[in-house]
Amino acid sequence: MDEFDRRSWWMPAPDEAAWALPDDLRAVDPLSGRDCGWVNQMRPFVRHFSRPGEQVFDPFCGFGSTLLAAALEGRNAHGMEIDAARAQLARTRLARHAVAAPVVVGSLADIAPAAPIDLCLTNVPYFGCHWHGDVLPGQLYASSDYASYLTGMRAVFHALRKQMRPDGVGVAMVLVVVGGRVIPQAWDLGRILASLFTLREERVLCYRRPAATLAHAKTQSDRSHEYALIFQHCRARLDLQQAAQLLQAVQAQGLPVVVHGSYARWLASPTSVPEGPADLDLMLRGEQALWDRLTLWLQQQGFALSLWGEPCRAPVALAVVRAHHYLRAERIGADGRRLQVDLQLPVDEPPLP
């Protein structure tokens, strides 16, 4: 049986016939079960990132492969599935294995899960899969465009952050979809996860396929691999030296920023924040010219700006900042050191027209 180790890639063993999706269930699915994940691809992650009796959760549980894998490893499991027909297929499949794992119908963005979450393990829905089932709000398979697909994906993982236990681990498996050109689904999902969690690592799962010839200068592949993106519900500690230097430099620019949040509490009393501040939170009054000066200066210092994980460039309209509650600036040095700054308007600022 495969074990999770330091290998950056491996080839999961195909499922034993006993664990495969039964033909009668496959036959009634809108996609004929072609997107059903393997139980064996999930089991090494279950063993490595959870302990017996803990709760394994799949927010896109589909046919219940993750839940079955968790049960086989002695874990508790529960899932969510937005398509009611697929949720029933998962329940039927699990019942045939005498697995008691609740499957809630709905989206995690709208509905709370059935139990706490120690490990989130999932295959995310593919973009552009030509869904033939019921089209419901939040059904990512039915997304009409890539931007709305990514927005929906972010909503689910943002909700996950509120439900996951501190230091809990998540694994999201995703393909780089091709349709004549690459759609960087794995990297875009990684960007979303990195904005919400600490993105730790990746593994590449490869699946054996028969070799096939390719005409000269053609590029098509059999797409026989997927990425497992590993993230954790924790925040990296703030680099205190970099934060102090940046704050000094901002103040030297004559910008009237106000420090708040965990860094302000730490400055006032380091013992009150024994784990250290999580990030550098700065407030700046709602004058567009001041915000433009600060954000343009930060860009010149090597900071990348983003709104809820979406890259942006200065100047950024204050109405947009208010709608997102904060503007993030992050710099990654060549030595790997990171500095993250969250810029906010004062909470008592009047609404902008």
Q: What are these language model-derived features?
A:
Residues 246-280, 284-295:
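Active-site nucleotide-donor binding segment shared across nucleotidyl transfer reactions
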Residues 126-127, 176-178, 234-236, 264-266, ...:
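Short, solvent-exposed loop/turn segments at secondary-structure junctions
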Residues 1-237:
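Class I S-adenosyl-L-methionine-dependent methyltransferase catalytic core
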Residues 124, 174, 203, 261, ...:
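A cross-domain feature marking catalytic cores of carbohydrate-active enzymes
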Residues 100-102, 280, 341:
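Short, conserved active-site loop motifs that form the nucleotide-linked donor/cofactor pocket
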Residues 231-234, 285, 329-336:
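Active-site beta-strand termini and strand-to-loop segments that position acidic
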Residues 197, 257, 298-305:
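Short glycine-aromatic motifs
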Residues 301-349:
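Conserved catalytic core of two-metal-ion nucleotidyltransferases
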